[in-house]
Amino acid sequence: MTAKTEEILDSLKSLSLLEASELVKQIEEAFGVSAAASAGVVMAAPGAGGGDGDGGAAEEKTEFDVILESFDAAAKIKVLKVVRNATGLGLGDAKALVESAPKTVKEGIAKADAETLKKEIEEAGGKVTLK
């Protein structure tokens, strides 16, 4: 590898999950590509087959985004702990995410997992929506 590519790789290794996610979105926009294009084709095929057999199944959403809308100031630490556990973010990144609400906590997760996370955040004092 060249020194330039090694430097880029080292920079990428130091990114948090939130920063890496934002980087992927920026790359997708800048180059007009999708990082999940091949996985989307694999995922779409079973869904399309199920949709042909049952029209209702095609309309049911299977992946959800968990969005922290707001939180009680007194419960900030509790919400922060739940967000850290769910995302694997470091303290600083999780704090930044919580303080910048409304903000997406997790994207594209299963309905059951999304509902569980929503319940945990709400019990800690946050207000959450699923999209």
Swiss-Prot record:
* MF terms in GO: mRNA binding; structural constituent of ribosome
Q: Which gene is annotated as encoding this protein in its UniProt record?
A: rplL
Question: Taxonomic classification, please?
Answer: Bacteria, Bacillati, Cyanobacteriota, Cyanophyceae, Synechococcales
- UniProt xrefs under HAMAP family: Ribosomal_bL12
| Organism whose genome encodes this protein | Prochlorococcus marinus subsp. pastoris (strain CCMP1986 / NIES-2087 / MED4)
Q: Which family does it belong to?
A: Belongs to the bacterial ribosomal protein bL12 family.
Q: Which UniProt keywords apply?
A: Ribonucleoprotein, Ribosomal protein
- Please explain the role this protein plays, according to its UniProt record: Forms part of the ribosomal stalk which helps the ribosome interact with GTP-bound translation factors. Is thus essential for accurate translation.
User: One of this protein's GO BP terms?
Assistant: translation
One Pfam family per UniProt: Ribosomal_L12
Q: What is this protein called?
A: Large ribosomal subunit protein bL12
Gene3D superfamilies given for it? 3.30.1390.10, Single helix bin
GO CC list: cytosolic large ribosomal subunit
The UniProt subunit note reads as follows: Homodimer. Part of the ribosomal stalk of the 50S ribosomal subunit. Forms a multimeric L10(L12)X complex, where L10 forms an elongated spine to which 2 to 4 L12 dimers bind in a sequential fashion. Binds GTP-bound translation factors.
